[in-house]
């Protein structure tokens, strides 16, 4: 969604600089890694959280999610030199400020921001158990001599001797049963890509429009879901174009990609680095294949490149189209290559759909014929679908794992109902069942610990208002599968369902709503600065 300024977004703090001292890098790598990622892998809450009691530097503004005051408590006793140092913006903050001052500014000196400290921080953010690339180097092996390895990598980057390695082709199952191809990059490629992404984000987080949410720092899927729900409810929306780009990551045109990057980046070394990653190719079954188009899905740089490509191909064009050609209200919410456009008038929706098809064709993209639909949806859909379409109820659409339906609240007013997609629900249960078979001979305590984390992570994303029945059904099904697994371990099992229920109530979290209503969270996020558009 967008407001008074469609470019308005929330900036996220820069990651802390790594320890630049020559001693202790390798020894601290593992402990710092665990400290960074000791929390769960579920989506974080978008609401501000309170700090720990012993955090001395916490302020009221930080707790409440507000901006800092000009002079915080305790700042009067701070040495004057330290005060001046804290007020000096970081190098990337100066880049961000320059990008904000001029939308036409082209940056010619970015490559030097890929420092040894930034490379080390990038290394520590990589999962220790991440699959190795074509070179077979693992996180543990690289950490044994981290200082020397990082210095050597940085030296090769500065000399121009760095060579991007091909990605190793791997496949993961999709919810529809097909296989999704992934490109597993080598460890050093991941480090450099993460560092380059951090540098480039200082520019593009200023440029990206407000209705773009996917793979952006400080933005989460639930913010996109909230923005969509608010837009449909409070704007005059009667039609929804649910769109998906077919094979997007494999269809990115390399020439157009470089041209788009050159709008903001004139640093030849940075552009050369991006070209190396695009042309590195993939290795599958020992055979190297050149990359004529696309960016490997799974590479650390790919989400940023994908967002830049659609920023120029879709976002800027769509925002201009609704300002110049739309007769009624138009809302847009995009998450990577999956986006939803809402319209007040059917003729606007049809003209936009046709123009979008031609626009994508110019840049080697194509809308997925099965996943792209134009449906009647909104506050008047229930009335019009019976009178005009002869349907008993409006159609539904899927977005970010939830099926969106037209409904009413307790007062009889229009409200969007969001429930977990049936395909996602069944796929998750199927995965839990398969994993339980592998863990059949583990102790009950070990199984309980794992299942508790699974259910907790599922609730963390899916526990939205109106989805309580799905949460309860998921917890019940997990308990039943666990019960059957324990019974299979012994033919003389004395475990009955009543006792199993008591065990489950002890170790599995109860089904309860964890997320607020979209109106509450969206209002807290924008803080009244921009209306829904």
Feature map (PLM): residue ranges:
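Non-catalytic terminal/accessory segments
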Residues: 1-533
């Amino acid at each position: 969604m967008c407001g008074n300024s469609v470019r308005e977004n929330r900036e996220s703090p820069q990651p802390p600089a790594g320890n630049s001292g020559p001693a202790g890098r390798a020894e601290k790598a593992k402990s710092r890694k665990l400290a960074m990622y000791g929390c769960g892998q579920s989506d974080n809450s978008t609401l501000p959280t309170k700090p720990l009691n012993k955090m001395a530097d916490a302020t009221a503004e930080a707790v409440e999610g507000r901006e800092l005051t000009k002079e915080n408590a305790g700042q009067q006793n701070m040495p004057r030199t330290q005060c001046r140092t804290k007020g000096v913006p970081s190098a990337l903050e100066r880049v961000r400020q320059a990008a904000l001052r001029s939308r036409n500014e082209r940056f010619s000196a970015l490559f030097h921001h890929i420092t040894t400290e930034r490379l080390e921080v990038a290394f520590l953010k990589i999962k220790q158990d991440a699959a190795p690339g074509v070179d077979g180097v693992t996180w543990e092996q690289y950490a044994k001599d981290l200082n020397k390895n990082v210095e050597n990598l940085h030296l090769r980057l500065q000399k121009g001797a760095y060579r991007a390695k091909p990605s190793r082709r791997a496949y993961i199952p999709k919810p529809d049963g097909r296989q999704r191809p992934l490109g597993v990059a080598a460890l050093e490629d991941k480090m450099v890509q993460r560092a380059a992404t951090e540098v480039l984000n200082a520019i593009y987080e200023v440029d990206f429009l407000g209705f773009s949410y996917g793979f952006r720092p400080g933005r989460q899927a639930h913010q996109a879901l909230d923005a969509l729900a608010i837009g449909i409810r409070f704007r005059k929306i009667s039609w929804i174009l649910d769109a998906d780009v077919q094979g997007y990551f494999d269809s990115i045109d390399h020439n157009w990609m470089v041209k788009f990057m050159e709008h903001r980046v004139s640093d030849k070394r940075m552009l050369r680095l991006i070209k190396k990653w695009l042309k590195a190719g993939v290795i599958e079954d020992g055979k190297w294949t050149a990359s004529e188009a696309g960016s490997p899905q799974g590479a650390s740089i790919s989400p940023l490149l994908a967002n830049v490509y659609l920023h120029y191909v879709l976002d800027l064009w769509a925002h201009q189209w609704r300002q110049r050609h739309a007769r009624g209200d138009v809302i847009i919410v995009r998450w990577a290559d999956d986006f939803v456009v809402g319209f007040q008038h059917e003729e606007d929706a049809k003209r936009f759909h046709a123009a979008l098809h031609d626009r994508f064709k110019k840049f080697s993209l194509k809308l997925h014929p099965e996943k792209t639909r134009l449906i009647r949806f909104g506050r008047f859909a229930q009335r019009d679908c019976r009178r005009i379409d002869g349907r008993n109820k409006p159609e539904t659409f899927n977005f970010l794992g939830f099926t969106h339906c037209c409904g009413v609240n307790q007062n009889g007013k229009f409200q969007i109902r969001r429930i977990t997609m049936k395909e996602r629900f069944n796929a998750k249960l199927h995965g839990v069942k398969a994993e339980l078979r592998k863990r059949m001979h583990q102790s009950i305590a070990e199984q309980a610990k794992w299942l508790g984390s699974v259910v907790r992570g599922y609730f963390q994303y899916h526990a939205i208002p109106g989805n309580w029945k799905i949460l309860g059904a998921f917890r019940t099904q997990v308990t039943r599968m666990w019960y059957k697994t324990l019974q299979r371990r012994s033919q003389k099992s004395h475990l009955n369902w009543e006792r199993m229920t008591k065990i489950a109530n002890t170790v599995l979290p109860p089904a309860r709503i964890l997320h607020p209503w979209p109106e509450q969270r969206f209002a807290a996020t924008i803080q009244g600065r921009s209306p829904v558009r």
